[in-house]
UniProtKB/Swiss-Prot annotation:
Ranges annotated as biased composition (Basic residues): 233-245
Gene: rpsC
Region of interest called Disordered, as start-end residue ranges on this chain: 225-245
Domain of life, per lineage: Bacteria
Organism: Azobacteroides pseudotrichonymphae genomovar. CFP2
UniProt xrefs under SMART domains: KH
Designated name of the protein: Small ribosomal subunit protein uS3
GO CC terms in record: cytosolic small ribosomal subunit
Subunit structure: Part of the 30S ribosomal subunit. Forms a tight complex with proteins S10 and S14.
Pfam family, one: Ribosomal_S3_C
A Gene Ontology molecular function term of the record: rRNA binding
Its biological purpose: Binds the lower part of the 30S subunit head. Binds mRNA in the 70S ribosome, positioning it for translation.
PANTHER family xref list: 30S/40S RIBOSOMAL PROTEIN S3, SMALL RIBOSOMAL SUBUNIT PROTEIN US3C
C-alpha cells in the first residue's frame, strides 16, 4: 500500500500535521468550502511566490493563515503593503478578522511542491524535460536529500501516444512511516496537452526504529518492551517464564 497511497496522508500525525486545524459543527461543509476558496485564491494570487503549503487555523472570531514560501519578500512587499492587501481581500472571503503568518522555506530544493512547480513552469517554457528533471534531481541531492523520484506523464516531446517516464536517485522508503517523505503533484499546460509531474523527496528518518516503536506502541495497545525488539522478553512471555526465573 505504500506504493499506492499518498505519502503525506499516510504519515499524518506522525511526520506532518493537518493543513486545516479547526472544529466544525453543522456548518462543517461551509467552512471546508471556504478553506478551499482561500487556498485557490492564494495559489492564484501568489503564483510567483513559490508557495509550498497553506495552513489554516480557525477560532470563533479569527482566521489564521500560515503561508509557507521560498520567497517571503514577494508576499510581504515593500513595508508590508502586500500583506495588508491580502488581509483585506481574505476578509471579504471569510467575513472575519484574518491574520497572515509567513514561514520561509530555507531549502526549496528539498520541498516537493516547489520542485514540481518549477519543473512544470519550465516545461511550459519549452525546455527539454529530461534536462529539467536531471537538474532538479542533482540540486536536491546536493542539498542533502536521501533520495528523490520524479515521474512525468503525458505526450512527451509531442508524440501521439501518451506515456510516463520515471527518474530516481537515492532511496525512497514509502513503506517506512518514520521516513520524512514529501510528495507533490503539478501540471504543465503545453501546446500538445497537459503534462503531469509527480515528485517524491526523502529527507531522512525522523525517528530511529526503536524510538518509533516505543513512542507509538501505546497507540496500538502493545507493551512497551514487546515492540522494542527485545527477543528475550518475547521468548519468556511465549514460554510462560517469569523474569526472576
Amino acid at each position: 500500500m505504500g506504493q499506492k497511497i499518498n505519502p503525506i496522508s499516510n504519515r499524518l500525525g506522525i511526520i506532518r500535521g493537518w493543513d486545516s486545524n479547526w472544529c466544525g459543527g453543522d456548518n462543517y461543509g461551509d467552512i471546508l468550502y471556504e478553506d478551499s476558496k482561500i487556498r485557490k485564491y492564494l495559489n492564484t494570487r501568489l503564483a510567483k511566490a513559490s508557495v509550498s503549503r497553506i495552513v489554516i487555523e480557525r477560532t470563533l472570531k479569527l482566521v489564521t493563515v500560515v503561508v509557507c514560501t521560498a520567497r517571503p519578500g514577494v508576499i510581504i512587499g515593500k513595508g508590508g503593503q502586500e500583506v495588508d492587501k491580502l488581509k483585506e481581500e481574505l476578509k471579504r472571503i471569510t467575513s472575519k478578522e484574518v491574520q497572515i503568518n509567513i514561514f520561509e522555506i530555507k531549502k526549496p530544493e528539498l520541498d516537493a511542491a516547489i520542485v514540481a512547480s518549477n519543473i512544470a513552469r519550465q516545461l511550459e517554457a519549452k525546455i527539454a524535460y529530461r534536462h529539467v528533471i536531471k537538474v532538479a534531481i542533482a540540486a536536491a541531492m546536493r542539498m542533502g536529500a536521501e533520495g528523490i523520484k520524479v515521474q512525468i506523464s503525458g505526450r512527451l516531446n509531442g508524440v501521439e501516444i501518451a506515456r510516463s517516464e520515471m527518474y530516481k536517485e537515492g532511496r525512497i522508503p514509502l513503506h517506512t512511516l518514520r521516513a520524512n517523505i514529501d510528495y507533490a503533484l503539478s501540471e504543465a499546460l503545453t501546446k500538445v496537452g497537459l503534462l503531469g509531474v509527480k515528485v517524491w523527496i526523502c529527507r531522512g528518518e525522523v525517528y530511529s526504529k526503536q524510538d518509533f516503536v516505543v513512542q507509538f506502541a501505546s497507540q496500538r495497545g502493545m507493551n512497551r518492551y514487546e515492540g522494542s525488539g527485545d527477543k528475550s522478553v518475547k521468548r519468556r512471555k511465549r514460554n510462560g517464564i517469569k523474569k526472576n526465573e
